[in-house]
Design a protein with these regions (language model features):
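Short, well-ordered surface patches within globular domains
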Residues: 79-192, 229, 235, 239
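A well-ordered secondary-structure block
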Residues: 157-267
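N-terminal secretory signal peptides that target proteins for export/translocation
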Residues: 1-12
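Cell-envelope/ECM-targeting effectors and their regulatory/trafficking segments
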Residues: 49-68, 92, 132, 188-192, ...
Length: 268
């Protein structure tokens, strides 16, 4: 009797723990849709700002509809050495540098809803991106930006763009990745001019739009120290050079090289 009673007690206790655990899992699973609800794709602030093929003017107009001070942020608008996508790269940087929290609530929260496990599926884009970390890196970015302070804007540099273009050509011709080659970042930049205080470089591969390229670097999937994100949000970088082109390993979109500096003076 006692043994049977003990077994019955253990069964009831284990069943209670099972139902409590199941309830906890259901509650946690429900958290994500409550926080990151599917966006209304008819509104101006949805993924449409990230659509492929937008001119600088079209991108700026869609951002204006989302309440951004585009005249202030679109610092590359008159840079005739940049094409529209390269101008959009600078504008996309300035969005998140100017108001990280707004960027998170408008765009990162939206991108989170496009993850299915570790696959990222952007509406209207056939290519499916397979990530290593899945949605967790994007959710981390969201909360990180809520705690991030605004920093100064970036302004285009023709000479830094030359350095970026040189490196993009180098890696594309060889079908390789990374920041090495031609002596490294410092040597490449110093062939063109003199930099002050700090320099940095980011590379985005195979992005379907400039907006997506910056978002991809901010999410920084499988980069443990989130170095791309840190550079984009770094205080004290004022100048940026951008180069866009095709990379043979990423034929479904454009690749971008970005060179940053506190200040830069070209050689005479």
């Amino acid at each position: 009797m006692t043994i049977k009673a003990d077994k019955r007690y253990l069964f009831i206790r284990e069943a209670a723990w099972f139902f409590l655990l199941a309830f906890f899992i259901i509650q946690c699973t429900a958290c994500s849709p409550l926080l990151f609800q599917k966006v209304n794709t008819e509104s101006a602030s949805t993924a449409r700002v990230g659509d492929p093929g937008l001119s600088n003017e079209e991108y700026a107009m869609r951002l204006l509809a989302d309440g951004w001070p585009v005249d202030t942020l679109n610092t590359g608008v008159n840079a005739d050495f940049l094409d529209d996508d390269e101008k959009n790269i600078i504008l996309a940087h300035n969005l998140v540098r100017y108001d990280p929290e707004k960027y998170a609530r408008l765009y990162v929260a939206e991108y989170i809803t496009y993850f299915m496990d570790k696959e990222f599926r952007y509406p209207g884009v056939e290519t499916i991106m397979l990530t290593r970390e899945g949605v967790s890196a994007a959710e981390e970015l969201y909360f990180d930006l809520l705690r991030t302070r605004a920093v100064n804007l970036l302004y285009p540099s023709e000479d830094l763009s030359k350095a970026a273009r040189s490196h993009l050509r180098y890696i594309s011709q060889r079908g390789i990745r990374g920041h090495g080659g031609q002596g490294g970042l410092r040597a490449r930049i110093e062939r063109i001019g003199i930099w002050e205080e700090r320099i940095a470089e980011n590379i985005a591969y195979g992005s379907f739009s400039a907006h997506d390229a910056v978002m991809y670097m901010l999410i920084d999937d499988q980069v443990i120290n989130r170095s791309h994100r840190k550079i984009i949000l770094q205080h004290g970088l004022h100048k940026v050079g951008v180069a866009k082109g095709m990379h043979p390993a990423y034929p479904t979109g454009y690749s971008y090289v970005m060179n940053y500096a506190y200040d830069f003076t070209p050689h005479d």
